[in-house]
Each structure stands twice: as C-alpha cells, then as structure tokens.
C-alpha cells in the first residue's frame, strides 16, 4: 500500500500542483489588474465581503467535503463505485440543507452581519455562498478519486472567465458588485463542470450498493461534524482579520492587508495541494502513514521555503508591483510569510490525526491556532492596523505548531528537525546577503533560490528520492529531463548523492 500511495500521491498531486500554480497566477493577475483600475477602498470592501462569504461557506458545508473524503478515498481505491455514489448523494443532500439553513440565517441577521454593505452585494454574497459550497464539495470528491486532471482543466476555464468578466464589468457597473459577480461566476461554472465529471465516473454503476442512504447519511455527518468545528474555527481565525480591518481601520487599510494576505495564501496553496491529495490516501492506508506524511511536509517546504523566505527581504518591492499605495503592506507581508513554515507542519499533523480518526486532536490543533488569532486581532488591529493583523495571524500559527508537535509526539510523528532547520535557514542566509547589495529584486530572488537548492543538494538535505518525488507531480516528458539534470548536478556536488 505504501508503494501504491506514493504513486497515487505523485500522480494526484501533479495536476493539483499545476492547478494551484495556475490559480495563484490568475489570482495575482486578478488583484493586480484590480489594483490598477480601482482603489484600495474598492478592494477593501470587496475582499472583506469575500472573507465573510468564506466563513459562511465553512458554516454551510458542515464539514461534509472533508468528512466524506475520508470514506471516498478508501472506497475509490478499492473500486467500490456503487458505494461511492451513495456517499456522494448523501453528501449533496446534507450540504444543500446546510446552504438553505445558512441562507435563512443570513437573511434574518443581514443588518447585523452585512449592515455596512448594499442590498445588491448581500444578494450576490448569498449566491456566492451557495455556488462556492457546492463547488468545494464536488472538488473534494474529484480529489478523492485522484482524477485531478479534471480539476486543472476546469480551473483554467473558470479562472479565465472570472478574470475576463470582472475586467469588463468594472467599467460598466459598480466596482464592488463587479468583483463579487466575477467571484460568483467562477465557482458556479466550476460546480457545473465538476458535476458532469462526477456523473461520468458513476455512469456505469449499478444500484447494488451495500450502503444504505440513511445509514450513510449518519456516518458522514458524525465524521464531518468533528472536522467541521476545527475547520470553521481555522477559517474564522484566518478570514476575520480582514473583516475587522474594514470595521476598525477602514476599506483602504483592509485592501492593503488583503493583497499581502493573498500573496501568502497563494504560496501556501502549493503545500495544501500536496496535503489535500495525501489525506484520502492516508485514510486508506494501514501502515506507513507517518513516513508518507514526513515526505509530503519535507517536499512541500523544499518547494516553497526558498521562495517565501526570499520574499521577506523584498516585501516592499513585491507590494509596490500593485501600486505605490500598497507599499504600506510590506511589513504585514513579511510577518505573514513567517507563518508558512509553522502552518505547513501543523496542518500536516492535523491531517494525519484526522486520518487516524483522532477528531479530538484535530479540534485541539485547530482551536490552538484560531482562538489566539482572534484574541490578538482585537488587541493589535486597533493600534497597529495591518501589521497587527499579520502579527496576530502568525502568532496563532506558531501556537498551533507548538500544540500540534505536543500531540504529534504521542504518535511518534516523524520530523527530521535538522533537515527542516536547514531548509529554512539556507535560503534565509542567501536572501539576507543579497538584500544588502541593492540588486534588483527579481534577479536577487532567483539567485537566492538557485543557490539555496545548490547547497541543499551539496549537503544531501535534498536527496535523489526527494527530487524524484518532487518531480513526479509533473508529466513524465517534463519530469524525466529535469530529474536527470538535477541528479547530474547533485552527483557533481556530492559523490554520495
């Protein structure tokens, strides 16, 4: 099973990884263009509403996407498509009920929750909640099937439509409305295309499942609710900062902070892609889970840390890309980038605990990061604006890391700290050194990343197996030449490579 898992993770993560890169590129292009044709106030209002919608989506989903994925991962691997169909149908029923209930509550409490927004934005927000919730569930189902190539294609289509439509609408109607309409179209279009893809998976299935609808409904709900609470708290802890920025510091400051936050979310998404594919695999495994988790955490950090650490020393240049008004976000960006390392480890341990069925530990890890964040938001945002919000987020990530390590110790989690420290510190040294020489930030960041990988190869912190596993996410005609080239370099740098 371990050998199968490595193949499945590599294959499944291939398209998710590329999809995340494309989503990241589309996202940066989206907010870059908006920053050029609108104002920070428009971005602040739009982004805070999107953050509220994200919280509402987490409530409406009732944790069903993650809860159902735990069962679907094993069912798909065993080829029991009739049973998988029952799980999918049960999940859709629960999520639909959650959307209806959440919409009713939102309409009743609209003055309290959305008092700062116009009526048309509230209506669009409800549509966005429904579309996004269904989209996330269907996306998780396809991830569980490991047929993630479909996600890549659908994301390219939906993201392109969102970007083009929003640019057109900004010049025609109110800027905030155009942003929310664009965000609504993408998940709705994706959900429709995902639905057709899932239908094709079950096209040849018979109605002879061993699962009963009501019984499956209860099992999924029991597994989902325990995952729902920590997931909801994590969502609130990460998203409420932008909402509070709007309420306390105003739309301008909220927009600046949101851009910095999105940059970090885009980088972190690469690790989340690997861990998302790993979850259904880990749930289906009986042995070797801890080793697989360590490999995933290490590979993810090897990919993102050289970049994220380098950006810390050039944060002002990065924020200036979006316009001179956004340079205030350089310090918040630096603080948020620090959170990448602790978040990757704590999220990985949390996924392993959920795969083990230790829901209480998942809840504790989630609360350990989200509750301190919320408390710190109230303390730091009034006095330190975006810097306070970023500091609160990162402090919550560090506390979550500490708690996850305490929990992980009980299960003998495999973490090679020597490798982790070097993966973090080597890019730090190069980026700091280059930043003292007034190089243009683009070549400086590239040089820092290249030198970091050379040293990691030289001292065998990145091994031949790491390279092969990392490149397995790419198509073979691309991966093989890269692997051969890197292996040649590694062999020249270290004879024992």
Where in the sequence are the language-model features?
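Interhelical loop/hinge segments that connect adjacent transmembrane helices in multipass membrane
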Residues: 1-9, 176-182, 194-238, 277, ...
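Membrane-proximal transmembrane or re-entrant/amphipathic helices at the cytosolic face
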Residues: 2, 435-497
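Signature of the first transmembrane helix
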Residues: 7-65, 103, 128, 163, ...
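Transmembrane helical elements of multi-pass membrane transporters/channels
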Residues: 11-28, 158, 182-198, 211-280, ...
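Helix-loop junctions and terminal segments of transmembrane helices
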Residues: 32, 61-78, 144, 260, ...
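Interfacial segments at transmembrane-helix termini and the short loops linking adjacent helices
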Residues: 110-125, 251, 311-347
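Hydrophobic alpha-helical transmembrane segments
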Residues: 123, 152-202, 367-373, 386-407, ...
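Membrane-interface junctions at transmembrane-helix termini in multi-pass inner-membrane proteins
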Residues: 131-154, 284, 337-368, 410
